[in-house]
């Protein structure tokens, strides 16, 4: 049985933890790919199914890093509500907050900074 529809990141059946935790050649999980596709519903479903919001790919990036770099405010908010680590550092020692500032995504920066009082 196929887990994913053709050309889609969305599962066509209930999501198992083995599917959620499966990695591609970059070490990305389904959560990383859902963020990249801006699929907030899939992000929520992965969280509900018990997906780890702090899992890192092979570059050390979490899903929150990706949301911060791309300026995906709504997804960043969902990840934060689920316990995403705002202080997670990738292999280059950059945090999601620093990524948001570097890319000019001040709404995401404000959410990270204000809600979690981390400052820079």
Residue spans for each PLM region:
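Short, compositionally biased segments
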Residues: 90, 108-120
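Ankyrin repeat domain, specifically the short helix-to-loop turn at the C-terminus of the second helix
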Residues: 13-17, 44-51, 77-84, 113-117
């Amino acid at each position: 049985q196929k887990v994913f529809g053709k050309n889609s990141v969305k599962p066509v059946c209930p999501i198992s933890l083995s599917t959620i935790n499966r990695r591609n050649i970059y070490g990305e999980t389904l959560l990383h790919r859902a963020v990249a596709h801006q699929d907030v519903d899939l992000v929520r479903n992965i969280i509900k199914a018990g997906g780890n919001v702090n899992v890192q790919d092979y570059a050390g990036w979490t899903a929150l890093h990706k949301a911060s770099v791309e300026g995906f405010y709504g997804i960043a908010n969902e990840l934060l509500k689920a316990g995403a680590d705002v202080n997670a550092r990738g292999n280059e020692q950059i945090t999601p907050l620093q990524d948001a500032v570097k890319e000019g995504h001040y709404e995401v920066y404000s959410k990270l900074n204000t809600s979690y009082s981390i400052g820079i």
